[in-house]
Design a protein with these regions (language model features):
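Loop/turn-to-beta-strand initiation segments
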Residues: 211-212, 245-249, 277-285
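Conserved alpha-helical scaffold flanking the Walker A/P-loop in AAA+ ATPase domains
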Residues: 170-174, 228-249, 267, 271-275
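Walker B catalytic acidic pair
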Residues: 218, 252-254
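Long, basic/Gly/Ser/Thr-rich N-terminal segments
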Residues: 1-116
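Charged, amphipathic alpha-helical linker segments immediately N-terminal to NTP-binding catalytic cores
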Residues: 105-168
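Pre-Walker A segment
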Residues: 151-152, 172-180
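Short glycine-rich substrate-engagement loop in P-loop NTPases that contacts/grips substrate
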Residues: 156-166, 184-199, 203-245
Length: 330
């Protein structure tokens, strides 16, 4: 019997049958011998199991042999952890089995828990608020970008990307909410998605520093403001209040704003720029256009009295960052 098949058989038995489930005595003895040997070779696991055994009776070990075997095999995978969720070989990525003693059944059972790296991921993603995008998409874009750049020799293949991310990492490391920062208008001239992925990577870098970040898809946000459903409109307006105050704000596709009336543009585009500048909050944006953000903002508000002022605000809030790299990530 293969080890994988062995695990599934004993795991199923231990989960579906109470207490001392019925298997052939010879198989049970072999299983118990295997568990003892595995515990002897795994000091850390032994230190977790011994206190649980002491809580039980003389039958606890025998009752728990199936679940102990399952735990030890799972723990062996964790011992050789690649320290990256994207390389975790488990079917349930980011989760591990944790043994606990069940007094009623006099056996040790396994609870499924998040591993260290999954906990770190969940904590970081929880700091992306408000979020008008998929948090999982943000994580995957970050992982794709940073994993590639960390490989030896790859940073020289994407020099602009590496430089920009390094600059942001330094800012995040010494971030002071009371200090005024200038953000970036990130434009990638040789890739349609690299600028967005870089901004997503930047988002995650800030959250890893325990800094709250808002991530807004501009089309979705402005579409929400003019949605026929008042509940959707109300939610977009609540999000706007968060956008004003969040320490770091990401605006994806700032040029891609749906057809809205002048009042909406005045209140929520010009108003956002005013509030972010007044509060000294750092803001980043991407656009799918070749023009700079100063001219972009003017083009959106040129028919309003605030057009020139909004253009000046954009120039103060954003520094132009052009990424000339070709996207050579796999």
């Amino acid at each position: 019997m293969s080890k994988e098949k062995d695990i599934s058989v004993f795991a199923t038995l231990s989960q579906s049958m109470p207490g001392n489930f019925e298997i052939d005595d010879n198989d049970r003895n072999h299983l118990e011998d295997d568990v003892r040997k595995m515990l002897k070779d795994n000091v850390r696991a032994l230190s977790m199991i011994q206190p649980l055994i002491k809580k039980g009776t003389s039958e606890t070990f025998r009752n728990s042999s199936g679940s102990l075997y399952e735990f030890l095999v799972d723990n062996e995978i964790c011992i050789h952890c690649p320290s990256k969720l994207s390389k975790c070989p488990k079917k349930r990525v980011g989760y591990l089995l944790h043994p606990v003693y069940d007094k009623d059944r006099d056996e040790i059972k396994n609870e499924l828990r998040e591993c260290q790296y999954q906990q770190e991921k969940e904590k970081a993603l929880s700091l992306i608020e408000p979020c008008y995008n998929s948090k999982e998409a943000i994580y995957k874009a970050m992982d794709k970008t940073l994993s590639f750049l960390r490989e030896p020799g790859n940073s020289s293949k994407m020099i602009d990307t590496t430089k920009l991310i390094t600059e942001v990492a330094k800012t995040a490391l010494s971030f002071d909410k009371e200090k005024m920062y200038k953000g970036y208008h990130i434009r990638s001239i040789n890739s349609q998605t690299l600028d967005r992925d870089v901004m997503m990577a930047i988002t995650y870098i800030y959250t890893k520093g325990n800094i709250r970040v808002g991530y807004i898809n501009c089309y979705k946000f402005f579409a929400g403001l003019v949605d026929k459903d008042w509940i959707v409109q109300d939610e977009a307006k609540r999000v706007y209040q968060k956008m004003i105050h969040v320490p770091v704000l990401m605006l994806e596709n700032l040029n891609n704003i749906p057809q809205v009336n002048d009042e909406i543009l005045m209140t929520y585009l010009y108003g956002l720029l005013q509030e972010r500048d007044k509060k000294g909050k750092i803001t980043y944006c991407t656009t799918s256009t070749s023009i700079g953000v100063k001219n972009l903002i003017y083009s959106k508000l040129r028919n309003l009295a605030c057009g020139n002022e909004a253009s000046k605000l954009a120039d103060m809030i954003f520094e132009e960052k052009v990424i000339k790299d070709f996207d050579v990530r796999p």
